[in-house]
Amino acid sequence: MLFRSAAAAGPVHAVRVDSQAKYALVARGDADAYLRLSPDAAYAECVWDHAAGALVASEAGCTVTDAHGVPLDFGAGRRLFGARGIVCAPPRLHARLVDALRPLLG
C-alpha cells in the first residue's frame, strides 16, 4: 500500500494491510495505489484474493490491471495465470506506475 503523505512531495509509506481492505483504501482515496509484485514471474495469484476488491476499486473509478497494464481476467479459472503482478490506482496515477514498472519486469 502506498499511503498519501502529509506533504505532497513527502516520503512514500508502505503499510501492511490484510485481506481485500487494500483495494477499499485506494477506492476511498486513503491510499494512492496498491502494488503487488511477486519475485517469481511464474507465480499466479488466486482469483478469490483479488476479485471482490478489484470490483470495489473499479466501481469507485480506479484502474486495476496486472503490472503490464493488461486487465485481470477473473473468469479464466481459479488463478490469474498470465497476469504479472497487480496494480490498482486512480487513472491519473495508474499509467505512470505501469510505465515505471516496465524496466523492472523485463
What are these regions (language model features)?
Residues M1-G106:
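An extended, acidic
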